Amino acid sequence: MGKTSGAKQATVVVAAMALGWLAIEIAFKPFLDKFRSSIDKSDPTKDPDDFDTAATATTSKEGL
C-alpha cells in the first residue's frame, strides 16, 4: 500500500465524524427532542437568582 494523501485522510476523518454525529442524533433522538423543546420554552428574561432571593426572603419573614 502506498501513502495516502492528506486530503484523502482528512476526507475520511470528516466523513467518520459526520457519521458518528448522525448515529448519536438518531440514538438519542427522544432525549434531544425533549431537551430542545424545554430550551425553547424557557424564559431568557427570568433571572433564577432574583426568584430564589425573593423566595428566601418570604420564607424567612414567615418563620419569624
Swiss-Prot record:
Residues 33-64 are cytoplasmic. Residues 39-48 have a biased composition (Basic and acidic residues). The chain crosses the membrane at residues 12-32. Keywords: Chloroplast, Membrane, Plastid, Plastid outer membrane, Transmembrane, Transmembrane helix. A motif (AKR2A-binding sequence (ABS) required for chloroplast outer envelope membrane targeting) lies at residues 29-35. One of its GO terms (cellular component) is chloroplast outer membrane. It comes from the Eukaryota. It is found in: Plastid, Chloroplast outer membrane. Confined to green tissues. Changing K34G: Impaired targeting to the chloroplast outer membrane leading to plasma membrane localization. It is a single-pass membrane protein. Changing A23P: Reduced efficiency of chloroplast-targeting. Residues 53-64 have a biased composition (Low complexity). Residues 39-64 are annotated as: Disordered. The keyword Transmembrane helix applies. Residues 1-11 are chloroplast intermembrane. The transmembrane plays critical roles in migration to the chloroplasts and/or subsequent insertion into the membrane. Interacts with AKR2A. This is Outer envelope membrane protein 7.
